[in-house]
Amino acid sequence: MAGQSLRRSAWVPLLLRLLLAGIAACEASPADDGAGPGGRGPRGRARGDAGADEAVPRHDSSYGTFAGEFYDLRYLSEEGYPFPTAPPVDPFAKIKVEDCGRTKGCFRYGKPGCNAETCDYFLSYRMIGADVEFELSADTDGWVAVGFSSDKKMGGDDVMACVHDDNGRVRIQHFYNVGQWAKEVQRNPARDEEGVFENNRVTCRFKRPVNVPRDETIVDLHLSWYYLFAWGPAIQGSITRHDIDSPPASERVVSIYKYEDIFMPSAAYQTFSSPFCLLLIVALTFYLLMGTP
């Protein structure tokens, strides 16, 4: 018995020594293992490399540190710059009036020689595959529209309008004229819509299919229609009555397959274009030259 107790007491110091060595090994971190000469940091960089004098951050277990390191790895490139975001929307391409009468049809209403940026109202159309592309622009901060009518009068017309809302956006909406009022139609044939409000003008561009299923509120554009031109103010993104009592209209039906550049003088520039006015001027001139009897 005495011999067994002696052998046990000889093993105790050895066991204590092994236990202390194990505890010391558990307390050592991975970064400490590579801290000696020739060792490597947590990202594999040799201690002798450039930047060795910089302090290498230790990997803490807190959520904030983890989230920050995850962001660095997920959203930063190798050079440390953020990855590029989606490119911004392309700016609105300027309407090319030089193509009027050649590759697209145009209507200009306003001052003689005006263009898409100076006319009171401007519209262009052209065929692109199975669609018709329309471009509209008007001197207004509200809305600009074109109506497709079987006559020159408002009522029972298919209308496409570009509306400037309170958020600064220009939206393409579909309406159906009921008498003098425009009722919005949920079925909107417009596609590839874009619009802008600049220099107190509403300008937009969109495409619409040539052929559509038969419907009371939408017409087939492969047929010829009178075009009605209108524009006016908007309140909280809703259109109100147009600016002039009798909106201009095309003199004859319009075919989308025929490109013309048609100018229509506004009221301020058509005073002397009326035959009655011309006759009155001639009569007054003759009266002044001949004198009174």
From Swiss-Prot:
Comp. bias regions, Basic and acidic residues: 46-61
UniProt note on tissues of expression: Expressed in the brain (at protein level).
GO terms (BP aspect): regulation of AMPA glutamate receptor clustering; regulation of glutamate receptor signaling pathway; regulation of postsynaptic membrane neurotransmitter receptor levels; regulation of synaptic transmission, glutamatergic
Signal peptide interval: 1-28
Residue numbers spanned by region Disordered: 30-61
Keywords: Cell membrane, Membrane, Signal, Synapse, Transmembrane, Transmembrane helix
Transmembrane segments: 271-291
Subcellular localization: Cell membrane; Synapse
Gene Ontology terms, MF aspect: dynein intermediate chain binding; protein-containing complex binding
Primary localization: membrane
InterPro entries xrefs: DOMON_domain, FRRS1L
GO cellular component, one term: endoplasmic reticulum membrane
Listed CDD domains: DOMON_SDR_2_like (cd09628)
Subunit-level organization: Component of the outer core of AMPAR complex. AMPAR complex consists of an inner core made of 4 pore-forming GluA/GRIA proteins (GRIA1, GRIA2, GRIA3 and GRIA4) and 4 major auxiliary subunits arranged in a twofold symmetry. One of the two pairs of distinct binding sites is occupied either by CNIH2, CNIH3 or CACNG2, CACNG3. The other harbors CACNG2, CACNG3, CACNG4, CACNG8 or GSG1L. This inner core of AMPAR complex is complemented by outer core constituents binding directly to the GluA/GRIA proteins at sites distinct from the interaction sites of the inner core constituents.
Purpose of the protein: Important modulator of glutamate signaling pathway.
Protein name: DOMON domain-containing protein FRRS1L
Lineage: Eukaryota, Metazoa, Chordata, Craniata, Vertebrata
